[in-house]
Structures are given as structure tokens and as C-alpha cells.
Amino acid sequence: MLIDTFTIIAICTLVLLVILSSVLNPFMRKVESAADADENEVAESEMPAVSIVVLATGTTETLDAHLSVLLTQNYEQPYEVIVVGVKGDLSTEDVIGKYSVDHKNLYSTYIPQRSLFISKQKLSVALGVKAAHNEWIVLLDAKDRPASSMWLRKMAAKMDKDTNLVLGYSNYDPEAKPYYRFDRLRNECYLLRKASRKTAYRTESGNFAFRRSEFLEQDGYLGNLQYVGGEYEFLINKFARTYGSRIAVSPEAFVIEDVPTKKAWFNRKLYLKSIRKDLERTSAARSLYVADLLFMYLNYIAIIAAAAYSGLTMNWILLGTSALTLILTITSRILSARKAYRKFEADLSLWTVVFYEFSIVFHKLSVILRYRMADKYDFTTHKL
């Protein structure tokens, strides 16, 4: 049987798209650069004193559960834990009082119940930084808990003299919806890789360290006080400098975030959408993300179109090629995901990878729709 020109072109196109969509995959790329290798870590004797700032606005129960892990870190150098709560929150004060009896490195400071022209989270960060006694500050939310007692040591191992930001990996508790955990992992692969390779763009959550002096010298959140969200994103985006960021991605450095509600998960997406236009380096960061999705969907569309056409025209060679490229695509994406799942210890089913990836665009559309329907004053502290 002779193969016509159209069939040859179609087969070549399918093969090319399979290759491109496999390469353009965040799970395929290595997250760490050579600079973040273990042999380049700071010696234990040279690790700095650290201040851990914990944001505890309305999270008393989780604060009580997580403080014990923070206060018993296996860290040889001095470190302090500063809890920032809301003034008048007696339950938070009780929790701090309970732990401060045995832990003299536990401190607290409080924000007023009402704050004008700045969100409570940003005000909490600013007060926590000012209350800190050390140059290096690690920022956490009370709903975050370190995965091990080695967490602080693994983060501090990246705090060398040439570094001003250290980003760690964070994901939701295994009880959270699998798609939420998949989405966080996929986004972290982009953000951690960018931080490790050149200049950090933003972060998905807490579990990062920065220098107190830079925060104070550059007036903290000045320039984005009008936004309710973005307390993590703006810090990374503003203070990141070229080749000045390092990442800590060993399992001991992981942080586990409590299970989010559906509303909380969507709110985080909405807040990000509201601030993205004011984040620097957005175009460069988004271009790779868009390219990955574009070629993934083009690949699937081409396979489906080729299969439908070949079935109608009884072009069995093209139909067989369509089936083969579909198998290769699914296999490639599962194997790439398995690599990332193992590295970040993600308890996710490999068989759901294709479905989760395919549904990304629908989740994006849902966020866009919610954002357009929302009151834009919900995203700003300046409501005059």
C-alpha cells in the first residue's frame, strides 16, 4: 500500500507534537540547578541564627498543633519563634502562654483587630520582621507544619553569604483533594526551578526565608499595600535578585499545609489573579507555562483529529499512528509525573495525571469566571 503525501505529513506532525509536548512538561524538567546540590550547602557550624515568624490570625487550633514541631527543631544555632496574632485573641494568647513556660525562645506580638489600608497578613509580616532579632527570617503560616525536625537545618543550609532568598517546597496535607495537591506540585515545579536557575518570580505559599535588613531598607510591602492578597508573592517578587535565590527541596525541608476548604483554595487563585499584573517578570514566567499547556492540548487535538479523519477515510496507517502516538503521549506524561511524585513524595495516583492535566484549562476558566463576577473591592484595602 502506497502512502500519500498527506498521510506522511500527518504522521510527521503527530510525531513532532508528541516529542514537543513531552519535552514541554514541567514534570520532565529538573528543578534543582548545580548550585543547589548538597555539596554546596553551608556547614552546620556556619549556619546563621534564624527567626521563624508565624502568622496566626484566626488559626488557634492549628497553631497549638504545630508549635511543638517548630520549637523542637534539631538546629544547633540559636533560633527564635515569633507568633504574630490578633490583639484580644485570648485563645492564641493561651496557646503561647502554654508553650512559653518551657521554651524561652518563643515570642509573640499582636496586630490590632482592625487595620486600615493594609491587610492583616501583610501587617503581621511587617510586625514580625520588626520584632525579629536575627538577620535571616523564615516565614510560615500557622496552618503550615514542618515535615520533620530537620526542616530548619535544611533551610539554613542554603543561607550562604551570596543568597538573599531561600525557597522551600510546600504542599497540602494528604487528606486534601488530590487535584489541589497535583496543582500545587505542578506550580511548585515551575516556581522552584525559576528560583534555582536565575531569578525567583513568586511562591505558592509560606516556607521561605529572606533577609530582615532588606525588608526594612526597602520598606517591606511599600508599592503593593493596596492589595488584600499577595503577602508571599510580593516578598519574593520584590526582593529576588539574579542568582540570589536558592531552593531547599529535600524531603526534610518540606512543609505540609492544612487541608483547604474549596472557598479558601479558590480565594488564593483569585487573589493571585488580582495581583499578577503588578508582579515583575510575569511575562517571562508565564510564557513557559502557556507553551507547556498549548503544546499539550495541540498534541491531543491533533491525535483526535487524525484518528477521526483516518477512521472516516479508512486510512489504517494514519489510524494506527494516531493510536501509537496517543499511547506514547500518555506513557510519557505518566513517567514524567512519576519522577516528580517520587522526588516530592506526592501520594497521588499516576493514572489520574492525564485527566488532571487535561482539566487545567477548565479550572482556569472557572477562576476567570469567578473573578469577573466578584466585587473588585474584595481584593483591595483601599475602598474609598
Which residues are covered by each model-predicted region?
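Membrane-embedded multi-pass helical conduit in multi-pass membrane proteins
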Residues: 294-377
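Short aromatic/hydrophobic "clamp" motif used to bind/position activated sugar donors
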Residues: 137
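Acidic donor-binding/catalytic loop of UDP-sugar-dependent glycosyltransferases
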Residues: 141-157
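Cell-envelope/extracellular polymer assembly enzymes that use nucleotide-activated donors
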Residues: 48-51, 80
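Catalytic donor/gating beta->alpha subdomain of glycosyltransferases that bind UDP-sugars
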Residues: 159, 165-167, 171-187, 216, ...
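Long helical/loop segments within the catalytic core of UDP-sugar-dependent glycosyltransferases
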Residues: 110, 115-120, 124, 155-222, ...
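Acidic donor-binding segment of Leloir-type glycosyltransferases
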Residues: 68-114
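N-terminal membrane-anchoring/stem segments of glycan-assembly enzymes
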Residues: 1-43, 337
